[in-house]
Amino acid sequence: MHELTLQQVNRLDDDSFVDAFGEIYEHSPWVAERARSSRPFSSVDELRSAMKRAVEDASREKQLQLLRAHPDLGERTEMTDASEAEQASAELDSLSRSQYETFQRLNETYRERFGFPFVMAVKDENPDAIAAAMERRVDHSESTEFRTALDEVHTIAELRLAERFSSE
């Protein structure tokens, strides 16, 4: 996706808006669909807030679907270009066999406990820090971890959104 200016975003038709921002939240174009009615945006932060509000105002089931749309970290599966780049920046695409097995075990434990994959904004992190966060967060209460995971999703979306805009 090429960089956009805010002026261009405000002129997009509804379908083009969803095409441009439908993957900001992993496999969840409904977020962009709900946020588009808030146009025109006076700033990128206003767009970010509209998208975040769309998630926060959604039902818990819809939020759970959003969390479940994220790939397991360190998995060697097909994922969106954005997820692939984020995981590569954290060296999760080149784990040793031992690290890979550790991530598989942690992912399985976490998913069994919470019913959704571990979500973390991993851009420019490292495998050891990510594994430590997984081990720490698996001890959270269900409500604390659900909130933490949603906050991480918002951070990921914010980073992705920033990449879409050129300086005006």
Swiss-Prot record:
Pathway: Purine metabolism; urate degradation; (S)-allantoin from urate: step 3/3
Signal peptide interval: none
Coiled coil regions, renumbered to chain: none
EC number: 4.1.1.97
Active site, per annotation: 70
Chain sites annotated for binding substrate: 71, 83-87, 118-122
Domain of life: Archaea
UniProt KW Lyase keyword: yes
Role this protein plays: Catalyzes the stereoselective decarboxylation of 2-oxo-4-hydroxy-4-carboxy-5-ureidoimidazoline (OHCU) to (S)-allantoin.
Protein name: 2-oxo-4-hydroxy-4-carboxy-5-ureidoimidazoline decarboxylase
Record organism: Haloferax volcanii (strain ATCC 29605 / DSM 3757 / JCM 8879 / NBRC 14742 / NCIMB 2012 / VKM B-1768 / DS2) (Halobacterium volcanii)
